[in-house]
Amino acid sequence: MITTLAALALLADDDWNFKLSLGFDASGDAQTVTNFRVDIEGDQKAEDHSYETLLRIQYGESEGERIRNDVEARFRGDWKSDEERWGLFSDTRFRIDEFQNFDTRLTESLGGTYQIYENEGDKKWNLDAVFGGGFRLDSGLIDPNADEFVPEGNIGFRGSMEPSERHVLKGSLFLYPDLDGLEDYRTFTNIDWNYMLDPDQGLSLRINADQEYDTARLVRSAWNVKVMVQMEL
């Protein structure tokens, strides 16, 4: 919650870059399916820190019936330490989802990062390890006996690659074990590819795929893939 309040203050800073991504698809073969997604992303980078924020809205219908309706907000901060390769991070996420076993979910993770590899040559790429702990807090649970507050660990990797000036590929994989029993856990996987179509206009083609799996809440585990147009604001 502290990082959520800090995020609001940080967003007031002028030194931010914002991007808008729009994705839409529709089909009318065996059934009529319509989906859309809106991402508003922001980032701020300095020598000693970096911040990332995201607001995502997703909606879908099939044969006139609503099949998806969720909103997610994220804020992540990374701070470099005096020790080379080491750093600290804070990751806050808040989600409202009509079609899960909960109405709202707040997650918070704090911990350390270690830079496994970094290449600043023509093909820039880096790989970081992430480790720490935090919690998830759910409301509106379908199961009245389920715990609303659960402490969690956080282990994972994240990296990025720039094969050329126009291509950027990012990916991350995180495991969140339930510290109350360790038999339950969450995983989150994300892959993001961006191709710059028009550098002057800040227009890009973006393909994003993510998957979340939760053994305790039976969160949908299917890949969420979207082809989007991204523009700099």
Which residues are covered by each model-predicted region?
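Membrane-embedded beta-strand positions of outer-membrane beta-barrel proteins
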Residues: L20-L22, T53-L55, L88-T92, L110, ...
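Repeated loop/turn-to-beta-strand initiation elements of outer-membrane beta-barrel proteins
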Residues: W16, E47-T53, E83-L88, N119-K124, ...
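Structural signature of outer-membrane beta-barrel channels/translocons
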Residues: S27, E41-E47, D78-D82, R95, ...
